[in-house]
Amino acid sequence: MTYQFSHDDLIWKALGDARRRLIIEVLATGPKQTGDLVQLFPDIGRTGVLKHIDVLTEGGIIHVRREGRTRWNHLDPEPIRSVCNSWVAKHIDGIKSSATKLKLIAEKEQ
């Protein structure tokens, strides 16, 4: 039996690497050519950067537009926002409960 990755799994995978998070931060300032992104990581070269771009594209975080031989990479922050909001919503009740308890303890001590 093999596990099927959900779309959310692909987004978390994309966010799980520091280099991919840096690519996201750079693209948050605007679209960049692939060559610009390659310059950020001289240690892994073009092939390594393209593999990271592929993971981000698979998660829907980056959209690539080709103009001739030039690849423009565009950030779509919505998938990140969606999985983060969903994850926080699942855990917020416990956080609210802890905060309420902390407030009650603090008020008793006064």
Segments and roles (model prediction):
Residues 1-7, 25, 81-110:
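Amphipathic alpha-helical dimerization/coiled-coil segments
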Residues 58-68, 74:
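Beta-hairpin "wing" of winged helix-turn-helix
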Residues 6-47, 70-82, 86:
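N-terminal helix-turn-helix DNA-binding core of bacterial DNA-binding proteins
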Residues 13, 25, 57, 63, ...:
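A cross-family signal for key residues in well-ordered alpha-helices
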Residues 50:
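Conserved catalytic core of two-component sensor histidine kinases
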Residues 53-54:
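Short, hydrophobic-biased segments on the C-terminal half of alpha helices
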